[in-house]
Amino acid sequence: MEFTKLSNRLDLVASFVPAGARLLDVGSDHAYLPIALLQEGKIEAAIAGEVVEGPYQSALQNVADNGLEDKIEVRLANGLAAFEPADGISCITIAGMGGRLIADILAAGLEKLANVSRLVLQPNNREDELRAWLVDHDFHIVDEAILVENEKFYESLVVEQGSQELTAKELRFGPYLMREQAPAFVQKWSKEVEKLAFALEQVPVENQSARASLEERISQIKEVLHVSK
């Protein structure tokens, strides 16, 4: 059997899935993630959820091609509608979507999450909005990681049940990411400083409020990166 090779960003998601988990992968596309995790023997079983017919059929085919029909059930469903409490799901992964959409998916199935011990979320934008939603709904970020793939930055959030308070700065930058200062984190926010500095150059001197706003954002990033002015 040929093992499924994950992209670096999905491999990062996989690394945070607990051993022995019963997994729901939302927006599973070709079911690459659950297939790889089962081939490694890391998880017990999985549901691959897809809301679009084409990727749903691709996932069905991939699961069959790998002989995993007894371990992975592919379901055509929207978000958390892909599982019921009786499925015994212990971990949910959601990757490849915006932070606001991930929050909407979680909100729509919030009552189903009581017995889910871990969420592994990889938004491709609006990470701060997702963190804010999680904090507002009594979820606790227990770890974070960041990588760059194909010139795009991906932040992964590892989330469990329990309340947590985060500052505005922690919501924006990530409590673990800003503390660990991984090379990809520094690269991401250094690029953001460059973009904001360019935008500042375009703002007329007389527009003091706009300039002050941009300068404040630049200053905050430099403070987090420990860069002198």
Which residues does each predicted region cover?
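S-adenosyl-L-methionine
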Residues: M1-G20, I35, L60-A86
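Class I S-adenosyl-L-methionine
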Residues: E2-L6, R100-K229
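Conserved class I S-adenosyl-L-methionine
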Residues: G20-D29
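Conserved SAM-binding loop of SAM-dependent methyltransferases across substrates and taxa
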Residues: H30-I43
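Conserved SAM-binding motif I beta-strand of class I
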Residues: A45-E50
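Short alpha-helix immediately C-terminal to the canonical SAM-binding loop
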Residues: E53-Q57
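Short SAM/SAH-binding signature in class I
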Residues: G88-G96
